[in-house]
């Protein structure tokens, strides 16, 4: 009986980090779809004073964090057209401790940048619409899902 309990304890200690990592990755994949893909592009009411102000209010609400991110990238393309670039990710980005890749195709992207001329308690954003390639973070090396956008090329 004692050896069964010891075996169970060892299994819990070994498997728990894997389960937590799996849950974290699944959340990151879900958040990528929700927070970085807007296709077709939504229109926010005029009261939001622009696309990025409406979007970033949504992003902060979804993350349950009222911190104002300095920059946020939103891709206006179907998820599947972005996802395929994480199928074979040979690069490892040590700064992020994740696999990463540069897309071969350009995508329509809105870059939301925090307006520096504002009160510290408000989050006001400028919108820039561009068409560029993406540096993506991927959930693993092969057959992966995108979990973040780390820059443009």
Curated annotation (Swiss-Prot):
Summary of the function given for this chain in its UniProt record: Does not exhibit any ribonuclease activity.
Alphabetical GO biological process terms: defense response to Gram-positive bacterium
Nucleus keyword on record: no
Record's protein name: Probable inactive ribonuclease-like protein 13
Main subcellular location of this protein, as a coarse class: secreted
Protein location: Secreted
Alphabetical keyword list: Secreted, Signal
Keyword Nucleotide-binding among record annotations: no
One Pfam match: RnaseA
CDD domains recorded: RNase_A
GO cellular component entries: extracellular region
Similarity comment text for this entry: Belongs to the pancreatic ribonuclease family.
Lineage: Eukaryota, Metazoa, Chordata, Craniata, Vertebrata
Family annotation (SMART domains): RNAse_Pc (SM00092)
Molecular-function GO terms, alphabetical: nucleic acid binding
InterPro entries xref list: RNaseA, RNaseA-like_dom_sf, RNaseA_domain
Signal peptide start and end residues: 1-22
């Amino acid at each position: 009986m004692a050896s069964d309990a010891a075996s169970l304890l060892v299994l819990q200690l070994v498997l728990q980090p894997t389960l937590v990592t799996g849950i974290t990755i699944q959340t990151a994949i879900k958040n990528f779809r929700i927070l970085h893909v807007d296709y077709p592009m939504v229109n926010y009411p005029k009261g939001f004073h622009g696309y990025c102000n409406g979007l970033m209010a949504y992003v902060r609400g979804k993350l349950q964090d009222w911190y104002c991110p300095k920059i946020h990238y939103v891709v206006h393309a179907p998820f599947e057209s972005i996802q395929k670039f994480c199928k074979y990710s040979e690069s490892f980005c040590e700064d992020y401790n994740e696999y990463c890749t540069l897309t071969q195709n350009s995508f329509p992207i809105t870059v939301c940048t925090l307006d520096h001329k504002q009160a510290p308690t408000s989050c006001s954003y400028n919108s820039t619409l561009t068409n560029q390639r993406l540096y993506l973070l991927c959930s693993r090396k092969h057959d992966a899902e995108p979990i973040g956008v780390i820059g443009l090329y």
